[in-house]
Design a protein with these regions (language model features):
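Short loop/turn segments that flank or connect secondary-structure elements
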Residues: 1-148
Length: 148
């Protein structure tokens, strides 16, 4: 397993269709890429103003950062590998793993459907988010006037 894969490779990884014989009980064992350990989803406040979206533009301008909205709200999706992931996709600190890892459930995870496909909105670049902002705010280009 290549823990230094780029974001494009990671997107292809999560877009893969799972085998049909996968159940909740055997899903983690069939996930050879440790998909859940290759990204972080950080919930963010719902962006409402031009200033909020301008800040998101700055964030999504960085490598391996996406912004998405789903039924649970808005999130930053950060592609980054867990430093404890060993070759073969197993956790190197399993007995001492953080609580968030212990609470994680595989009832429905990226092995079933990629976050990108399950999202209502998905922005992987400045260009895509700015296009959305121009539609959402009629005076989007005038947002810089607040800084004058």
């Amino acid at each position: 397993m290549d823990l230094n894969m780029n974001a494009k490779d990671q997107i292809e990884l999560v877009d893969a269709t799972p085998p049909s014989n996968v159940t909740i009980d055997n899903k983690c064992g069939k996930c050879t890429k440790s998909i859940c350990c290759n990204s972080i989803n950080q919930k963010i406040p719902t962006p409402k103003s031009k200033e909020d979206f301008d800040h998101l533009l700055w964030q999504v301008s960085h490598e391996n950062i996406n912004v998405f909205k789903d039924a649970d709200g808005w999130f930053l999706h950060i592609f980054t590998n867990c430093s404890h992931l060993l070759p073969g996709g197993v956790c190197g600190i399993y007995e001492n793993r953080p609580w968030v890892c212990r609470e994680y459930t595989n009832d429905f995870c990226e092995f079933d459907e990629s976050i990108k496909d399950a999202s209502e909105l998905w922005f992987s670049s400045h260009k895509k988010l700015e296009k959305y902002c121009r539609k959402r705010f009629k005076k989007w280009k005038k947002r810089f006037e607040i800084y004058k």
